[in-house]
Design a protein with these regions (language model features):
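Sec-dependent signal peptide recognition
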Residues: 2-14
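N-terminal signal peptide c-region/cleavage motif recognized by signal peptidases
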Residues: 16-18
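Boundary of Sec targeting at the N-terminus
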Residues: 20-24
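Solvent-exposed, polar/charged alpha-helical surfaces in well-ordered, non-transmembrane soluble domains
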Residues: 25, 60, 64, 88-92
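The canonical Cys-X-X-Cys-His
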Residues: 27-37, 90, 94
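Gly/Gly-Pro-rich "capping" loops immediately C-terminal to redox-active cysteine motifs
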Residues: 33-64, 74-77
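Short, surface-exposed glycine/acidic/tryptophan-bearing loops
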Residues: 70
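Flexible coil segments in periplasmic/lumen-exposed cytochrome c-class electron-transfer proteins
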Residues: 77-127
Length: 127
């Protein structure tokens, strides 16, 4: 029983560590260009002041709005090939470095994010 529990916990730790590593890699290869120094008003990496109001909006809302494109940031960070999951991990990596305590979205949260994205996209089409 104890060994089985230990294996399950070990697997969870490995997956959460991998998600963090993936978020960091995506940040460094895509997001860092703007977020490292706050280019065009982008919230600066590790800036609690910049990120606090964003974090208050909630993980689901922020991921959907940002993935859709917000302020001067283009949709998907300007990378049409960037998957929602990879984008989410990078955003969570940045938010957590700036005071959030967010985890990778659950399946239910991804459903909410995708529903919000569908609404945002339908608004774009009618404008």
């Amino acid at each position: 029983m104890f060994q089985k529990l230990f294996k399950i916990i070990s697997i969870l730790v490995i997956f959460s560590t991998n998600a963090l590593a993936d978020g960091e890699a995506t940040y460094k290869s895509i997001c860092m260009a703007c977020h490292e120094n706050g280019v065009s008003g982008a919230p600066k990496f590790r800036s609690i002041r910049d990120w606090a109001p964003i974090i208050k909006e909630g993980k689901v809302h922020v991921i959907a709005e940002a993935y859709n494109g917000i302020r001067k940031m283009p949709a998907q960070g300007g990378r049409p090939d960037l998957k929602l999951e990879d984008f989410s991990e990078a955003l969570i990596y940045m938010a957590n470095a700036s005071g959030a305590k967010w985890e990778k979205p659950s399946e239910q949260e991804y459903i909410k994010i995708k529903n919000k994205l569908a609404k945002l996209n339908s608004k774009k089409e009618t404008q």
